[in-house]
Each structure stands twice: as structure tokens, then as C-alpha cells.
């Protein structure tokens, strides 16, 4: 992505704490893509403590869609390992509240929904490697257009654990072939942001019948000279909640992540070694 494209992302070089303050004040906008480059962004799942052990094991058995970067104690809305001033109830742009597998509300503040038995799971997000791609001048159309990344349910089943089962969900970004190679190279180095893609070029092989109709996010055109590249996605737990129907849960809304203080390991060296390369 050229410098003028980076300039369209006003919080690209913001600190994670600054982004969280914006979220807390309701001033961040609904999507955290392109914010706080060099740091891990996280999908959030909050479940009753009675389900925490099973969901923890589910994450460990499904590390591509659910790369675990943090887990709270029951009832604790602080997660110091991910941010010193962090409040899990207010520091995301938008949350979803779930009852019996149905999404019943979206809100920017869950303090009135908070329960003392909730355990929070933070799962790495592809926005982290998107920022690395941006820094390495690899263009992404949804960012250029100010849209959400398109996200799809697949025919790939997660490894089930206890009550938790459901399909792997993927995000898609179209690239010309040389940029696709670089996207694979760079994302492979960030396993906590889903790592390498799981499919390139053939959406029908993973059960996506209409690439122009994503299940979440916004449609993104795939040009004739481009390949659709699919990564495992942290929206997977929301598809799992819909299938597994726990009595209560809270998640992030798609695109509305927790921006953590956890640095991407080796980020500066990664960018220095890949920026300006053709392949």
C-alpha cells in the first residue's frame, strides 16, 4: 500500500491505549482495522465460568480460527497481560450479547450486562497481519474503500469439544498473484493472527457458493486478474455459539476488536525485511 493509502488510516500509528480510550469514549468508529500497527488485536468471547474449561480446550484444538492470546479469571474485567488500563466492558467499539445461541443486542458498553461468573477469552485477529501488510505496501481493497472485510462460513468443521462445535469461518482478501505471495509470506510469520491462509483461489472447495454474498462484513470485488485468499477468522466462535446455544455469552461485533498492548513478535524486523520486495 502506498504512503497515500496509509494516510487514509488516521490511527495506524496510534498507541493501543489511545485506541482503547477512543473506544471507551465512543469515538473510535465501529471497526478497528488499520489501527495501532505492530500490536495484536483480539476477538473477544465471554462465557459463564461453567463453560470456560471446555471453551479453553476448544481454542487449543482449533488454533487457526481461535489463536488464544489471553484468558481472564471469572468475573474479572481487567486483563493486565493485554493492557494495563484495560476494561473489557468498555474498550471495544461494539459488542454482541447472545442468549441461547441468538444474538439479542449490540451495544458499545456492556457494564449493565456484566456478570460475576464471566470468563473472557481473547483470540488473535487478522487485523494484526493486515497492519503488517499495509506497512509492507501490500494493498487491500476493503481498507482502500473503507469497508469491512468480507467473512464467510465454510464447510470445514471445527474440532468439537464438549458443547462447542460448528463451522470454521474465514475472511477473504483479493490479491494479484505477486501480492498474494507476499501476503502468505508475511501472515505466516504471525501465528497469533491466524497465520497462513487456509485456501487460495477456489472458494467452492470450502463451501462458499457466492463470493459476492459474505455472511458477515461487506462484499469486496475480486477482479479477473486477482485471487481470493482466505484466512481462518475469529468470527468462528460466533458461528459456534449459534450452533451450540449456551444460555449466555458476549462477543465482539465483527470488525470491532480489542486492541491490546501485546506487540507482534519481530514486527519491526518483519516489516524491514519485506517492505519494497516484489515477492
UniProtKB/Swiss-Prot annotation:
Keyword Ubl conjugation tagged: no
GO molecular function: lyase activity
Coiled coil: none
Keywords for the protein's UniProt record, in alphabetical order: Lyase
EC number(s) on file: 4.2.1.-
Class of this enzyme: lyase
PANTHER family assigned: D-GLUTAMATE CYCLASE, MITOCHONDRIAL
Similarity comment: Belongs to the D-glutamate cyclase family.
Record-given protein name: Putative hydro-lyase GDI0188/Gdia_2258
Amino acid at each position: 500500500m502506498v504512503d497515500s493509502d496509509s494516510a487514509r488510516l488516521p490511527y495506524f500509528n496510534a498507541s493501543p491505549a489511545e485506541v482503547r480510550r477512543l473506544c471507551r469514549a465512543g469515538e473510535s468508529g465501529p471497526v478497528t482495522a488499520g489501527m495501532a500497527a505492530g500490536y495484536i488485536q483480539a476477538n473477544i468471547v465471554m462465557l459463564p465460568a461453567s463453560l470456560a474449561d471446555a471453551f479453553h480446550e476448544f481454542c487449543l484444538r482449533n488454533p487457526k480460527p481461535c489463536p488464544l492470546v489471553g484468558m481472564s479469571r471469572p468475573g474479572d474485567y481487567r486483563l493486565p497481560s493485554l493492557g494495563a488500563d484495560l476494561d473489557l466492558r468498555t474498550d471495544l467499539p461494539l459488542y454482541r450479547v447472545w442468549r441461547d445461541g441468538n444474538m439479542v443486542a449490540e451495544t458499545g458498553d456492556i457494564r449493565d450486562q456484566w456478570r460475576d461468573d464471566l470468563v473472557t477469552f481473547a483470540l488473535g485477529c487478522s487485523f494484526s497481519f493486515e497492519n503488517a501488510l499495509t506497512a509492507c505496501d501490500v494493498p487491500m481493497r476493503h481498507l482502500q474503500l473503507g469497508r469491512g472485510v468480507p467473512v464467510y462460513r465454510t464447510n470445514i468443521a471445527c474440532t468439537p469439544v464438549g458443547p462447542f462445535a460448528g463451522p470454521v469461518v474465514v475472511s477473504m482478501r483479493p490479491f494479484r498473484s505477486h501480492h498474494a505471495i507476499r501476503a502468505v509470506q508475511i501472515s505466516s510469520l504471525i501465528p497469533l493472527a491466524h497465520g497462513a491462509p487456509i485456501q487460495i483461489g477456489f472458494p467452492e472447495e470450502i463451501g462458499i457458493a457466492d463470493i459476492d454474498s459474505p455472511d458477515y462484513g461487506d462484499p469486496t470485488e475480486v477482479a479477473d486478474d486477482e485471487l481470493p485468499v482466505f484466512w481462518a477468522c475469529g468470527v468462528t466462535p460466533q458461528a459456534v455459539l449459534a450452533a451450540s446455544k449456551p444460555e449466555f455469552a458476549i462477543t465482539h461485533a465483527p470488525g470491532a476488536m480489542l486492541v491490546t498492548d501485546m506487540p507482534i513478535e519481530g514486527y519491526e524486523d518483519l516489516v524491514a525485511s519485506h517492505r519494497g520486495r516484489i515477492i
